Amino acid sequence: MVEKIWFENHPLKYLLWPLLWPLSVLFGAISRSKRQQFQTGRKQAYQAPVPVVVVGNITAGGNGKTPVVVWLVEQLQHLGYKPGVVSRGYGAKAPQYPLVLNDDTPTQHCGDEPKLIHRRTGAPVAVDPVRANAVKALVELDVDIIITDDGLQHYALERDVELVIVDGNRRFGNECLIPLGPLREGVERLQEVDFIITNGGLAHQGEISMSLAPSKAINLKTKQQVDVSELKALVAFAGIGHPPRFFNTLESMHADVKVTKGFADHQDFDQKELEALALQGANVIMTEKDAVKCSDYAQDNWWYLPVSAQLEPKDAERILNRIKEVKATYGSPSA
């Protein structure tokens, strides 16, 4: 129902307006106050010894940030840099912080997105609610560029480049602040960022167009790869910010989907529930982010669908050149 109020102009929005509007005003006041404390110097933000690139958004929910983080890490690695990624680790609780991931780190400790990023890129990834501490842990590993997965509103960490990801189809919904709308900050905040990347839909003037390109489905147990259209009677589920995006992708690939099930973003799955869900079809298909959470008990007919961010070469060059410019000001040998 929240999604309908935020993005579909549901009539319930007007019924709840007297209750939610004051809360949105309060949310905005608190948000602005927190930022102003760092802007005016009343609170001191941490300045990392290496460039910090934020990949975030101004709306709640998933817009495609993680594929952009993966893309950016891979691009920087190709250029000879040593990027590392910091994250809050939403939905997880580590025994201690900062937590630097390894191949055996359970998602319950680090979160699904950090685990996915580490697995896809091999880059160092650190999780800490205090992102500055995660940055310090990565700097000790000789990382020379920091990328923050989310964290646009985490003003306790200074940043050099800001990339904001926008859902090109849903945009900013009713353009109201949380809880009446999906906005973490007002749309005017976009005037201050370096790049606005639009995921799907039609990019507006000044925005960079991006698409998510799916590849072959990968079996969780055997790593076999097949075209998703070859899998019959699929049960599709997704625990991401906007599950219908995944289901629409499957439809566009002519997948034989019989059942769909959406879960909350970062939800910790119940094994028995997924196993019962799997009985409704011949194969199970999920997102890569979901796969990192249930690989330990995956069955032979469970598959996931990786996606990769695709940008026009000229737009990719603009982003990378901006990061190179910033990197040069730090005077590192790898600049």
Curated annotation (Swiss-Prot):
Q: Name one GO biological process term.
A: lipopolysaccharide core region biosynthetic process
Q: Which UniProt keywords apply?
A: ATP-binding, Kinase, Lipid A biosynthesis, Lipid biosynthesis, Lipid metabolism, Nucleotide-binding, Transferase
The EC number(s) attached to this protein equal 2.7.1.130
Catalytic function, reaction form = a lipid A disaccharide + ATP = a lipid IVA + ADP + H(+)
Query: GO molecular-function annotation terms?
Result: ATP binding; tetraacyldisaccharide 4'-kinase activity
Q: Which SUPFAM superfamilies match?
A: P-loop containing nucleoside triphosphate hydrolases (SSF52540)
| One GO location term (cellular component) | plasma membrane
- Give the domain of life: Bacteria
**Pathway involvement?**
Glycolipid biosynthesis; lipid IV(A) biosynthesis; lipid IV(A) from (3R)-3-hydroxytetradecanoyl-[acyl-carrier-protein] and UDP-N-acetyl-alpha-D-glucosamine: step 6/6
Pfam families hit by this protein: LpxK (PF02606)
Family to which this protein belongs: Belongs to the LpxK family.
By its UniProt entry, which PANTHER family does this protein fall under? TETRAACYLDISACCHARIDE 4'-KINASE, TETRAACYLDISACCHARIDE 4'-KINASE, MITOCHONDRIAL-RELATED
Stated name of the protein: Tetraacyldisaccharide 4'-kinase
Organism from which the protein derives: Vibrio parahaemolyticus serotype O3:K6 (strain RIMD 2210633)
Name of the gene encoding the protein in the UniProt record: lpxK
